[in-house]
Amino acid sequence: MQFKLLSAIGIIIIVSGHCYHGGMELAYNWFPPYSYNLALFVFISGYFYKTDYEENIGKYIWKRTKRLLIPAYLWNIFYGGMVAFLGLFGFTIGAKPDLYNLFVMPFVDGEAFQYNLGSWFVYPLFLVCIINVLFRKFLKLIHLDNEFIVLIVYLAIGMIGINTAIENPTAINGIVKLFVRTMFFLPCYEFGRFYKAVLEKKDTLNNVAYFAIIFAVQLILLTFCEELEYTPSSFTNFNNGFVIPYISSITAIAFWLRVSRLLVPAIGNSKFVRLIADNTYGIMVNQLVGFMCLKFVFYGLSCITSGSLFGDFNVASFKSSIWYYYLPNGLQQWAFVYLIFGLFVPILISIILNKICNIVHPSSYLKKT
């Protein structure tokens, strides 16, 4: 249950990062979300890696393709159609739904149609899964299958990726962006596997000492480093070199690991937590549509009441920018409502699709996404 809760916390942090932190504070002053949010997500994926996958690599690759790639491409096609449809009503959000943006752009960028821009992470994560299982199979064949070796190699690759972005910022586009994203994710994935295989059984330090160490390290980072946050989607703003991003990821992951462990007894086998944790894929892909649904509510009420309600709603911005957020009276607290929509509209979509797919085909690709 600890990792269910950690998954729920992780996706809440990611979604809130797209809507003014969701109008709430989750230790963001200490752990800036864009210094670790995707790293935490990939860490969780790595934690659930099993060495059994190496026995039948073809089956594993096909399983990852069904679980990650095929749904992402289907969603991309859907949102391409949505861009074309909304374009009939004056919406200019998203790129032209041509063959390139439908089938190539998802892999090299993932943000063409905007409404599903959160899905960009699927493609480098897929490559990480494939590279990881192949590399581990190779190490096993030469009798060097050791978690320390994997960790060192992946860290070297990740740091090379970050350094490439630092030294050649204008070159980070197209297929290069896919490569450096994948390189960056590799150590984060191994952090999860390394924790499960090596560290978890040794994770017994008392809470006072544990948190004292984490906050001491984090305070040093905040004091002596520039802005800790970077932008993983565009792979930019690595202002502190190629080592600090991984250190800040480790401290934040360690913090939330222990917090989730401490909260489990109070939460128990919460259906609410499981609902969020079991739908992280759908939330990641469809969160922006959740935000748009709330904006449509504001827009509709403004039209129905002839501006008596929400009269300052900016229709032009609503139709032209996915990042326009209407906050009544400028209240940041409304960001919490955006967070709720960003979480539960995608969950509702996933539930409906799963019910439909279970009727049509019980082994649907979208099951449990």
Give short role names for the model-derived ranges:
Residues 1-369:
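Alpha-helical transmembrane segments and their immediate juxtamembrane cytosolic regions
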